[in-house]
Structures are given as structure tokens and as C-alpha cells.
Amino acid sequence: MRMTSGPDGGQRRFVALASRPATLIVVAAVLLLGTAAGVMAALTTDGSSRCQQAFVPAYFYAAGTWSQADQAKPSVMILDISGLGAGSAPVPHFRSVVSQAQAAGVTILGYSSTAYGLRPAAAVEADARDYKAWYGVTGVFLDEVQGIARELPYYRQLASYIHRVSPGAPIWLNPGGYPGRSYMSVGDVVMVFEGTYARYRDAPVPQWASHYQPARFAQTIYATSGAQLDRALRLAWSRQAGYVYVTNRSGSNPYRALPGYWTREVAAIGADCSRRVASAAKADAESRRPDPGDSGLSLGWACDRGHWRRHCGHLAG
């Protein structure tokens, strides 16, 4: 893997050298709720989540590391065969990996680099088609997204093709920063930050982001110490990040292994989710309590209509 520079000169993405062997690149979005009932409790009726979800850019292949990540019950994985996309032919090993993950209820997305709009659309479309035909993936993760107005037609064309091949398929975009707002109509989830904690602390958030549910945004924060972990997670939630990955790893590939505090990170996100679900359940229960009094009238109506003694007398000081 090597760090490359984005069109603005900043270090933006990690891509595989073409000469490297096929690798498995997985992003595991982890629902840290444990049961289907817990998942449903954490979702509002419009599909937005009350909880953060951890996702893992697992740019590693070691079976032990994969097993450690998998124990967190991933819900979404992003599969990259060649460092650019689906490769030139199906790989039996990865078919087996995908089948096992799907049998466990995991959603699989196929990784495809767009090279900031420079990769031919036909090549990206071929990735989407081949991923579905060879591995039965559910959706596509478009990496190295340009995010500017001039390239929007290119990404809309890709999204249109993906939906023709796989109606309703989820599309993730990774511009590594906030794109133009119009890109929210292209991607279901947009990775709006990818960088160090030092940069993240003062990273700007456009005002328009507050109009979207957290489940529409993902953020990756690396070079984050154990002492900074909790603060990073709180910042991510306050900045509308429904999906978050924080790691102490740094260097040319901070995704070479799981964070040293992976277990603690998973526990922290899960505990925070439990608090949010419990708080929401309490608020819902309170909203369903019977109105005061035995007439079925609301407190305000009863008091306004002169029923003070019966319904409101106990409030008199």
C-alpha cells in the first residue's frame, strides 16, 4: 500500500501498488448492539440511527487479525481484489470469504477506485458488474472521489449504472473530506474525513451537513493515542458521523492492523449506543403515559376549562 496525494496536494488515500498480489480490503461497519431487537431499537422509523457504528478499513490479510475484527459482528464489508477493483477474474478464495460473511448476515460492498474522476467510467462500471456476478456483492464503495461540481456528472453516471445492475444497491463515496452538497444525492454514505487526530480537532464542518442524518456520514481518524480515543469518538458523533473508525496506527498505512485499543473502542461505542437507546426508550415511554386525571383530558385542557380542583389542584403551592 502507498499514500497518494489528492488533487489538492494533500495526502488523501491509500491504494495498492499494481504489482502487489491480490489483497482483501475490508471495511467492517459494526453494529454494536448484539441482537436484532437492539438493532431495531436503535433505528428510528425513517431509517436513521441513534447510534454510532464502528467500521474497520481492514487493509490486512492475516487470518488472526481478520478473526479479531470479525468477532465484533461486522454488518458491512468492502471487498477489494486488486487495489483498484474487482480484478480480471474471480478469485475462489474470496468467493469463499464472501459466502461465509453473507451467511453470517454481512452486507458486502465491492471496492472501486475512481482516481478522482480520472479512471474511465467503463472500468468502474465493469467493477460493479463483475463484483456482483463473481461475488454477489450488495453494493459498491467508490474510492478517491473528486467531490467537485465539475465531476458530478461522472459520479452520477456511475451511480445510475450501479443501480441498473443492482437496483437499490447501497453506494458509499470516499472523497476524504466534505464534497459539494450535490454528492449527497449520489452516495448513501459519504466518508467526509480521513486524516490524523491533529487535523481532526479543528476540521471544519459545513452548515449543510446538519440537515442529514448521521447514518449518511463516515469518518476515519488515525494517529490517535489511547488518551485521545474517547474525545475523538465524542467529536465524531457531535459532527454527525454515524460511522467512525479511530486508530492509533499511523505512517504510510495506518490500516495495516487493528487499533491497539480495538477492544476498548468497540466497548466505548457499544456503551454509548446502549445509553442512547435506553434514553430514547425512556423518552418514548414518557410520551405514551396516560394524561393526568380520569377524564382522559390533557392537563392543559382541564386547567383551561376550569377543572382546576379535580385535575390541577395538586399543583397549587
Identify the role of each PLM range:
Residues 22-26, 296-301:
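Short, hydrophobic alpha-helical membrane anchors of single-pass surface/secreted proteins
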Residues 288-298:
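Extracellular Ser/Thr-rich, low-complexity/disordered mucin-like segments
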Residues 19-23, 34, 40-287:
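Glycan-processing catalytic domains of CAZymes
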Residues 1-19:
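Terminal targeting segments of Actinobacterial cell-envelope proteins
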Residues 47, 269, 299, 306-308:
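Secretory pathway export signals and precursors
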Residues 50-52, 274, 302-304, 311-313:
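Sequence contexts marking disulfide-bonded cysteines in secreted/extracellular proteins
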Residues 32-42, 309-314:
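Hydrophobic alpha-helical membrane-insertion segments, chiefly the h-region
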Residues 279-285, 295, 308-314:
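Extracellular/mature segments of secreted proteins
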